[in-house]
Amino acid sequence: MELTVRSILKQTVLPDEIVIADDGSGEETKKAIERLQRECILPIIHVWHPDEGFQRTVIMNKAIARANGEYILQVDGDVLLARNFVKDHLELAEKNHFVCGSRILLEPKITEKILKKEKFPPPFWKMPLGFVLNSLRSRILRRYMAKRYARSIGHMRGCNMAFWKEDVIKVNGYNEDLLQWGHEDSEFAYRMHFAGIEKKALKGGGCVYHLYHKQAPRDNEERHNQELSKVISGKVKWCENGIDKYITKKDK
């Protein structure tokens, strides 16, 4: 998480604030965030709830509700942002659209070097072959691919998304009935699509570098698949158990 924040502070265009969605971390993380709050030139809002297992959808809704900005760039706490990440995302920002960016999955050895404070980002020739394109930056490519590479609505990277807060409220945010890993971002994206909010793809810039770690358990993936299928077949726009319980009057 700390490396993620520090990569935000090195952006060519800085965001207005940083909101940390903390799904039950302990005292060590709290102290790290307090240190960053003292050092950082940007406001850092720490949104925390107790550890009751994997509850990403819940903490994401709470964090989005606390965000003061109209346009939200969403990343995970295990990624590092390319220096022009914010700039490239803002270039594609458009009303009634949400954006899905790309990630580069770093191998264990490269991750280890980065954690030792060695050079970041790694040169593209050290990237896994399939991710070389994601490491390249081109305005022409970004604009050309934005609506041509959007692929399926459900092809999402929750570690690299952008959306308008009013659109999140329109579909009631993340579905908090999905409490384990798997397809929660796709379910959210399909509801936005059925509400008339279209997907754009960010290629040729705005990538994140995903630090290597073991994948989370996928125990509930089948049930989440079933929920996703219901949303698609029923063209569902709204989830009942969502962000509305955290939204204040000023956001409505």
Residue map of PLM features:
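Conserved donor NDP-sugar-binding/catalytic core segment of glycosyltransferases
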Residues: N84-F124
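The conserved acidic donor/metal-binding loop of glycosyltransferases
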Residues: D76-L80
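A short, conserved alpha-helix in the catalytic core of glycosyltransferases
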Residues: H155-M156, N160-N172, L179-E198, K203-G204
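Short aromatic/hydrophobic "clamp" motif used to bind/position activated sugar donors
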Residues: I72
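Glycine-rich, basic loop-to-helix element that forms the pyrophosphate-binding segment
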Residues: P50-A67, N84
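Short, acidic, metal-binding catalytic loop of nucleotide-sugar glycosyltransferases
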Residues: R6-P15
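A conserved acidic beta->alpha catalytic loop
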Residues: L14, D22-A32, G53
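Short, flexible, basic/aromatic active-site loop/helix in glycosyltransferases
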Residues: K119-I153
